[in-house]
């Protein structure tokens, strides 16, 4: 089976387990994952033996060129959807409760009162967990672009640059070198702002001290997520201690990782080192997380 056939096989198995006649897919990452088509204002309807792409006039031409074999429905309005569901006789339809709004669900239920809409929870997240070889290649390609951006910024960064200029330089390099778009809003914070893990870049000159950059590239819909911290000016002893502690924790976790290990066990390997150095209260994040069609998958390395 090719990659798309594997995805549909997994989805059909999950649908069978939940006794679903069809699944209504509206989350952009899952729409792209199941169709090879980026359709931000449309949706998919997938049954055990058929798939339908609902796209308006802005996207139908692109859909014909890019979409995985599906029936393309040019009118995405609810009457067309309800007519199709009635024609097929579907009575249990799964929906993505993590992305479909309450208002949208209420609209579907009003148009199709005879249908039971069933929340799918993390069904798609579970399906996306196991990666095929070509998926891994896309993630690696995205990461290589991000790594190239880091090397690039080291070669061009200046004291008189602003946080927003550094962020823009990272994004420009990634776009120029094959990234479809940033994985998420690029973070670039310096000096006193560098303590904010998800701080917003400001049009202010770089401060001396730490400069933290958190960014990612996207290749064929697959994301990378990379964080790097450098020092503007000369690092003091405390900065060197922090750096050495984090590096030691990372290396210990990499060396300890093995198949079958519980996520919490691996997290503890790194966390114990950081705790022993006196920085335990500053380690609020989990040790790591997965990447794929989204930049932060539900597969994390938590403390429990």
Provide a role label for each language-model segment.
Residues 300-304:
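A short, hydrophobic C-terminal helix/tail in secreted or cell-surface proteins
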Residues 1-299:
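Active-site neighborhoods and metal-handling regions in enzymes and metal-associated proteins
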């Amino acid at each position: 089976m090719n990659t798309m056939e594997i995805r549909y096989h997994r989805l059909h198995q999950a649908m069978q387990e939940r006794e679903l006649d069809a699944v209504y897919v509206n989350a952009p990452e899952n729409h792209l994952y199941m169709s090879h088509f980026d359709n931000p204002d449309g949706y998919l309807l997938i049954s055990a033996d058929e798939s339908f792409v609902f796209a308006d006039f802005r996207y139908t031409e692109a859909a014909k060129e890019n979409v995985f074999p599906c029936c393309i429905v040019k009118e995405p309005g609810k009457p067309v959807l309800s007519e199709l569901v009635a024609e097929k006789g579907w009575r249990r339809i799964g929906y993505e409760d993590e992305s479909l709004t309450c208002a949208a669900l209420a609209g579907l239920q009003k148009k199709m009162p005879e249908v039971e809409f069933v929340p799918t929870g993390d069904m798609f997240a579970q399906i996306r967990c196991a990666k095929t070889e070509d998926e891994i290649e896309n993630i690696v390609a995205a990461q290589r672009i991000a790594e190239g951006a880091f090397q690039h910024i080291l070669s061009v960064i200046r004291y008189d640059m602003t946080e927003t200029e550094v962020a823009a330089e990272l994004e420009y390099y990634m776009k120029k070198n094959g990234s479809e778009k940033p994985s998420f809003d690029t973070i670039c914070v310096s000096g006193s702002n560098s303590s904010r893990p998800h701080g917003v870049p400001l049009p202010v000159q770089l401060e001396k001290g730490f400069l933290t950059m958190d960014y990612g590239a996207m290749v064929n819909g697959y994301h990378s997520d990379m964080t790097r911290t450098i020092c503007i000016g000369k690092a003091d002893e405390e900065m060197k201690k922090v750096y050495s502690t984090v590096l030691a924790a990372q290396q210990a976790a990499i060396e300890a990782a093995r198949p079958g290990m519980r996520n919490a066990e691996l997290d503890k390997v790194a966390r114990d080192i950081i705790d022993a150095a006196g920085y335990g209260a500053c380690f609020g994040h989990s040790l790591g997380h997965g990447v794929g069609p989204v930049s932060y998958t539900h597969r994390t390395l938590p403390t429990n």
